[in-house]
């Protein structure tokens, strides 16, 4: 009897162990399925990736700004040259330095004028090519529309209405005066013969 009881208890313990193992296995499988459904890009990974991309973009932007600033300084140094030492220079030397700066500035202005003319010519050529391409495609170039504020349109309409209102009032006033003048004129003409008859009597 004791052996049977001990065997039954051992069986119960084993069943409990097996049941707990099955529960743990089931829980792990469910978690694994949830992870598979989420995929590789979890919200945490997406957030980290966004931060990395922003950091990378900021670094690239900073490098580009530094590169442009370096090129600008280099071009300024090339075009303007190093500053002249004016300490102890006499009038003749100062005149020579000023003339050198003046000639250099005139040359830069001439180069600038040539570049502007070249830009205008290139823009004209690009415009002509665009017209030819649109003609071949059977399309028309859309005109550049001027941006107008909606408040300006409303204000213009109100001004127009006010002008029309004032014009009508003026017309009414003029008509009243005309009628009054005609009435006065008719009364004067009507009173003329009667007054003459009264005077004759």
From Swiss-Prot:
<dbReference type="GO" id="GO:0003779">
    <property type="term" value="F:actin binding"/>
</dbReference>
<keyword id="KW-0009">Actin-binding</keyword>
<feature type="region of interest" description="Disordered">
    <location>
        <begin position="182"/>
        <end position="201"/>
    </location>
</feature>
<protein>
    <recommendedName>
        <fullName>Troponin I</fullName>
    </recommendedName>
</protein>
<dbReference type="InterPro" id="IPR001978">
    <property type="entry name" value="Troponin"/>
</dbReference>
<dbReference type="GO" id="GO:0006936">
    <property type="term" value="P:muscle contraction"/>
</dbReference>
<feature type="compositionally biased region" description="Basic and acidic residues">
    <location>
        <begin position="1"/>
        <end position="33"/>
    </location>
</feature>
<dbReference type="Pfam" id="PF00992">
    <property type="entry name" value="Troponin"/>
</dbReference>
<feature type="modified residue" description="N-acetylalanine">
    <location>
        <position position="1"/>
    </location>
</feature>
<keyword id="KW-0488">Methylation</keyword>
<dbReference type="InterPro" id="IPR038077">
    <property type="entry name" value="Troponin_sf"/>
</dbReference>
<feature type="modified residue" description="N6,N6,N6-trimethyllysine">
    <location>
        <position position="142"/>
    </location>
</feature>
<dbReference type="InterPro" id="IPR050875">
    <property type="entry name" value="Troponin_I"/>
</dbReference>
<feature type="region of interest" description="Disordered">
    <location>
        <begin position="1"/>
        <end position="45"/>
    </location>
</feature>
<feature type="region of interest" description="Troponin T-interaction">
    <location>
        <begin position="108"/>
        <end position="117"/>
    </location>
</feature>
<dbReference type="GO" id="GO:0005861">
    <property type="term" value="C:troponin complex"/>
</dbReference>
<feature type="modified residue" description="N6,N6,N6-trimethyllysine">
    <location>
        <position position="146"/>
    </location>
</feature>
<feature type="region of interest" description="Actin-binding">
    <location>
        <begin position="135"/>
        <end position="148"/>
    </location>
</feature>
<comment type="function">
    <text>Troponin I is the actomyosin ATPase inhibitory subunit present in the thin filament regulatory complex.</text>
</comment>
<keyword id="KW-0007">Acetylation</keyword>
<comment type="similarity">
    <text>Belongs to the troponin I family.</text>
</comment>
């Amino acid at each position: 009897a004791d052996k049977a009881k001990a065997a039954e208890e051992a069986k119960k313990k084993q069943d409990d162990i097996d049941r707990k193992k099955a529960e743990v296995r089931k829980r792990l499988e469910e978690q694994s399925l949830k992870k598979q459904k989420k995929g590789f890009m979890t919200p945490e990974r997406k957030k980290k990736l966004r931060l990395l991309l922003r950091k990378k973009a900021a670094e690239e932007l900073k490098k580009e700004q530094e590169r442009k600033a370096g090129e600008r300084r280099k071009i300024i140094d090339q075009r303007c040259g190093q500053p002249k030492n004016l300490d102890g220079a006499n009038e003749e030397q100062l005149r020579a330095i000023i003339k050198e700066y003046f000639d250099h500035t005139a040359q830069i202005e001439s180069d600038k004028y040539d570049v502007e003319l070249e830009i205008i010519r290139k823009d004209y050529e690009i415009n002509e090519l665009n017209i030819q391409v649109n003609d071949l495609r059977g399309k028309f170039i859309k005109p550049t529309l001027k941006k107008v504020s909606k408040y300006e349109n409303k204000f213009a309409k109100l001004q127009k209405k006010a002008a029309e209102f004032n014009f009508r009032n003026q017309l009414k006033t003029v008509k009243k005066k005309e009628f009054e003048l005609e009435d006065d004129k008719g009364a004067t003409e009507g009173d003329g013969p009667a007054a003459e008859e009264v005077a004759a009597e």
